[in-house]
């Protein structure tokens, strides 16, 4: 009997208020970590109507010009006119950063050279064979659409587009394999003079049909482009934005569980971020090695403790190996202490602004070391013995 269902994921553009906040937090992190690799950073950002607040905790020896960093991010996104809902030149930027608690730091920086986890927490990694990047198809397509919205705006192909926007893609599955796109929702901020008819036609022709894979397109796709009508007021003028409010967009679009911890603004001693990257690295290499078609990996940590307190691997009935065998392999092949993760993935680099929009996973950029499949052969060798 054929098992058929729909699964939906969403993405947002770099001009979405929550993503603006993520990008500012990660730009602050990058500025600091480039100059002080021993820094501890937990940077949170709020953007609202005409102002930005940067807060959180730092332990660093260098000065970071918060105002300049925030304004440069907002300018790069494209909020260059108050008519867009925010202007990088006139917006107020308030700095409320404080010092990291020494109670936390004593458990992280240890005398034996190891690094304790910066907090307790559980994280998940995921990989599957639905795309070349070993990502779920719905989130992959949703990111392609929002990235294209930004590119078509910036290169002036669709000059009436403005920075804020979202996408949502519903994919039809049969027997756990994606077969077609069912519904596409795109909401995009725009200039007041463009008609909704022209906007919809342009978005479908210039973005959807030029970006999405032909094998999933068909004549019966349901399109909803700005379904409520006009979307002129957007960005922080329309909605406040906060760091860490798009954690499902940042990860797998709901295709696997989420531990609840956000990524942006956190240095890699925070396992919310670094261990989530490691969990993706593990899951992707398991799938790339051929020992399974799909993998969900959970890692859990205790504050100040070096080794993970638990490792869990679920291959969703796509592997001939047991969870216990797979866990044994993972422990042998991967370094999953905070220090091991930081060193093996080379995380003390200013790479985090690249992650802060269009997904932390499934993008094969050179800086994204957790996307490499260089452990696949070791995994194969483990199961040959």
Swiss-Prot record:
Residues engaged in binding ATP: 16, 164-166, 230-231, 239, 245-246, 262, 266
Cofactor note: Binds 2 divalent ions per subunit.
Subcellular localization, as worded in the UniProt entry: Cytoplasm
CDD domains assigned: S-AdoMet_synt
EC numbers, comma separated: 2.5.1.6
Cofactor: Mg(2+); K(+)
InterPro entries associated with the record: ADOMET_SYNTHASE_CS (IPR022631), S-AdoMet_synt_C (IPR022630), S-AdoMet_synt_central (IPR022629), S-AdoMet_synt_N (IPR022628), S-AdoMet_synthetase (IPR002133), S-AdoMet_synthetase_sfam (IPR022636)
GO biological process: one-carbon metabolic process; S-adenosylmethionine biosynthetic process
Pathway: Amino-acid biosynthesis; S-adenosyl-L-methionine biosynthesis; S-adenosyl-L-methionine from L-methionine: step 1/1
Keywords in alphabetical order: ATP-binding, Cytoplasm, Magnesium, Metal-binding, Nucleotide-binding, One-carbon metabolism, Potassium, Transferase
One Gene Ontology CC term in the entry: cytoplasm
Membrane among keywords: no
Keyword Nucleotide-binding: yes
Species per Swiss-Prot/TrEMBL record: Helicobacter acinonychis (strain Sheeba)
Functional description taken from the UniProt entry: Catalyzes the formation of S-adenosylmethionine (AdoMet) from methionine and ATP. The overall synthetic reaction is composed of two sequential steps, AdoMet formation and the subsequent tripolyphosphate hydrolysis which occurs prior to release of AdoMet from the enzyme.
Protein name (Swiss-Prot/TrEMBL): S-adenosylmethionine synthase
Enzyme class: transferase
Residues annotated to bind L-methionine: 57, 100, 239, 270
Record note on quaternary structure: Homotetramer; dimer of dimers.
């Amino acid at each position: 009997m054929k098992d058929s269902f729909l699964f939906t994921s969403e993405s947002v553009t770099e001009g979405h208020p929550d993503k603006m906040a993520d990008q500012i937090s990660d730009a602050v992190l990058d500025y600091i970590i480039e100059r002080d690799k021993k820094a501890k950073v937990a940077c949170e950002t709020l953007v609202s109507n005409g102002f930005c607040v940067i807060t959180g905790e730092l332990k660093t020896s260098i000065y970071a010009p918060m105002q300049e960093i925030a304004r440069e991010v907002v300018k790069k996104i494209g909020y260059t006119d108050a008519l867009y809902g925010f202007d990088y030149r006139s917006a107020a930027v308030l700095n409320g950063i404080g010092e990291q608690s020494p109670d936390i730091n004593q458990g992280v920086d240890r005398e034996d050279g190891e690094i304790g986890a910066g907090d307790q927490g559980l994280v998940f990694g995921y990989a599957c064979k639905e795309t070349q990047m070993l990502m779920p198809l719905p989130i992959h397509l949703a990111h392609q659409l929002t990235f294209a919205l930004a590119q078509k705006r910036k290169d002036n192909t669709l000059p009436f587009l403005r920075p804020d926007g979202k996408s949502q893609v519903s994919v039809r599955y049969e027997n756990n394999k994606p077969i077609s796109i069912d519904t596409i929702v795109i909401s995009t901020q725009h200039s007041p003079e463009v008609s909704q008819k022209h906007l919809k036609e342009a978005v479908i022709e210039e973005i959807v049909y030029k970006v999405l894979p032909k094998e999933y397109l068909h004549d019966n796709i349901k399109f909803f482009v700005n379904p409520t009508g006009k979307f002129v007021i957007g960005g922080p003028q329309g909605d406040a934005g906060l760091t860490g409010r798009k954690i499902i967009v940042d990860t797998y679009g709901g295709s696997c569980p989420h531990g609840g911890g956000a990524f942006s603004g956190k240095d890699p001693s925070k396992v919310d971020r670094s261990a989530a990257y490691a969990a993706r690295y593990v899951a992707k290499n398991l799938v790339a090695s051929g020992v399974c078609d799909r993998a969900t990996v959970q890692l859990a940590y205790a504050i100040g403790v070096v080794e993970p307190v638990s490792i869990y691997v679920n291959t969703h009935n796509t592997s001939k190996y047991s969870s216990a065998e797979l866990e044994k392999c993972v422990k042998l092949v991967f370094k999953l202490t905070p220090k091991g993760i930081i060193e093996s993935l080379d995380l003390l680099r200013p790479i985090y602004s690249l992650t802060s929009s269009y997904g932390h996973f499934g993008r094969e950029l050179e800086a994204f070391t957790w996307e490499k499949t260089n452990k696949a052969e070791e995994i194969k060798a483990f199961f040959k013995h």
